[in-house]
Amino acid sequence: PKGVAGTYQFHIKAAGAQGSWLYLNTETDYRDRRSITVSIQPNVVAELQSKYGQPADTFFIDKKIEVTGEAKRVTIDFMSRGRATNKYYYQTHIAVSSIKQLRVIKS
């Protein structure tokens, strides 16, 4: 399916990293089909840490954010011994490639 471009507001409940990428999640279990994942490129992660003065993976927990981008369903493969299995699930991701796409909303 096509993605839906827009500006979205979310409460972040969890965060995780894979390599230098950061993932902010709207549910504590990122596999929950209701969860929206904001995937942040490594260069933006570094900028966010510099801007907020603390690691981005902890800073955003329990904060409300506004993110601009395309919400898109992506297929996530289950892996075994470094190889994709024939099992998978879906997540909704919004990719962030610029710090301008993301801001904390003051409540």
Positions of the model-derived regions?
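OB-fold single-stranded nucleic acid-binding module
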Residues: 1-107
